[in-house]
Design a protein with these regions (language model features):
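Structured soluble/peripheral alpha/beta segments that form catalytic or ligand/cofactor-binding pockets
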Residues: 1-188
Length: 188
């Protein structure tokens, strides 16, 4: 595989928030509204589209802070990016962080609608996502399915707009289990 991937931020964001109830784990999108171009020489493929860059950091191991989480992001019709972080902390109540980001760096919270259980992945990873209409979001395809993590494309409605979202589910007890830790050096 040979080629070039170029990510061009349309603007930078200074938004950072706690994901857990004690403020020990933080998330912030660095460039939530970006463009990406992929130019491959071998194989000869080209692609351009919406991109997103973020950062997570913590003052303790992830397994100390969380049981699992679902995360999703989508590009809105006007070029904004909506992100939903739906986390189940080890301590305290369930948390949902939902923010809409503009290319100029502005952001605003929003209410993402009711959470629906989605079909488990092939590795039986539980998945869930919100939708503003009274039906479960539709999984278009599962892009990655491992013993602890699933990434999918799905259709849902956020802020009154039907969207296609990148969705991720992480099962942290599985991530830190001995069999998975032994497999991590190899592609799963």
């Amino acid at each position: 595989v040979r080629g070039r991937v170029t990510v061009k931020p349309e603007g930078l964001s200074r938004f950072v928030t706690a994901l857990d109830n004690e403020g020990l784990h933080r998330w912030g999108p660095l460039a939530p509204c970006s463009r990406v171009s992929v130019e491959m020489d071998n194989p000869q493929l080209n692609w351009v589209g919406h991109a997103y860059m973020d950062s997570n950091e913590g003052d303790e191991p992830v397994e100390n802070g969380f049981k699992d989480w679902d995360w999703a992001r989508c590009e809105m019709a006007n070029g904004d990016t909506c992100v939903v972080y739906d986390v189940r902390p080890q301590r305290g109540p369930h948390r949902v962080v939902a923010q809409r980001f503009s290319p100029n760096g502005d952001h605003e919270p929003f209410t993402p609608g009711q959470r629906f259980a989605l079909p488990a992945s092939g590795w039986r990873i539980p998945r869930g996502m919100c939708n503003e209409i009274n039906e479960a979001p539709q999984i278009i395809s599962t892009l990655e399915d491992t013993p602890f993590y699933a990434r999918s494309l799905l259709r849902t409605t956020l802020m009154g707009e039907p969207v296609t979202a990148i969705h991720e589910s992480l099962d942290i007890p599985r991530l830190v289990s001995l069999p998975v830790r032994l497999m991590l050096p190899w592609r799963m």
